[in-house]
């Protein structure tokens, strides 16, 4: 099972728009990928809500796509909290992950991607080599969809490679 995680809890974020684009592009490759947004993530500790998320989403997933906005040179703390609450061995060990950075700045959350790569390696995850930092995100989207052909092709190529990974 593939799961795309929009790693911010901000409502109406560009991150979620990008995650939906990834979901659509996976569908074009006949790969069903569920989308999990942290917009409604409310757990501050292991609770019934979190246990359900872990059992129904995290544990069954074999391949993850993390869409990560840049927050203070890294990725959102709410995503780190979710990871910290989880059973690391069941939720993350030996699973595959594709990393995507999203930012209005020039680097496309490259530092956050690097930081997450280190975390994923610590959690024994296999990180796909082609990481995509998408910079100037406000200029990349119109009506919640990518508008630049070069970005569309980069995303589609990344997805095709990840499917083979």
Name the predicted role of every residue range.
Residues 49-50, 81, 88, 105-110, ...:
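Short amphipathic alpha-helical patches
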